[in-house]
Amino acid sequence: SIDLGYFFNYNKRVYVGYQSSESSDIQNVNSNFISDFKNAFVTSQFEYIDFKIGDFLFPEKTVIHLKSGIGSRKSKIDDQNQFFVQVELKHNFYLNAKNIFHLKSQNYYLKSNSYVVNELHRFGGINSIRGFNENSLQGSIFSSLLTEYRYVLSSGMYIHSIIDYGYFQDQTNDVKDSLLGLGFGFGLLTKNGLFNLVYA
């Protein structure tokens, strides 16, 4: 992918770009839902980040990231015009210096008249809905609300709860389902960044 960006200021920026990908059916199944394909999209993005000055543990107070693309996919099954939109929102609610409520929402939608499995959005794991194996889930529609109650033990250490909820649709398998992840975690600020240990 390639992007051309314009910086409004320290917090806001926009991009226009182009991205493409291809996938091969290495098992040569070539069913109605698994096939070699190539896609290409013209994309646009908006990004807003509000930083909390002096907070090295949670430097990003608010994040808004919007991305959309219009393009097409070519496969052995058929050719399709497609559109996608991706939205990620994050915000920290500071109850006081030691108690923080963290909200994060990830959302994805791919519009197409037909789908192949290997083009679907992959999710699950520590960077999306926790309690599931990394990228073990797939769908053309995915929406989630990821929450943490964070208690700061010191300037470089905190513990937190995990309550994650998600919904997805996989039209290749005619699946519509809800997901729930529960757990807890521990975060430690190191010289190399934030080390996070999670059980969910």
Spans of features found by a protein language model:
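C-terminal transmembrane beta-barrel domains of outer membrane proteins
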Residues: 42, 62-200
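Gram-negative/organellar outer-membrane beta-barrel architecture
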Residues: 1-53, 123-126, 136-139, 194-196, ...
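Short, contiguous, pocket-lining structural segments
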Residues: 34-38, 56-58, 77-81
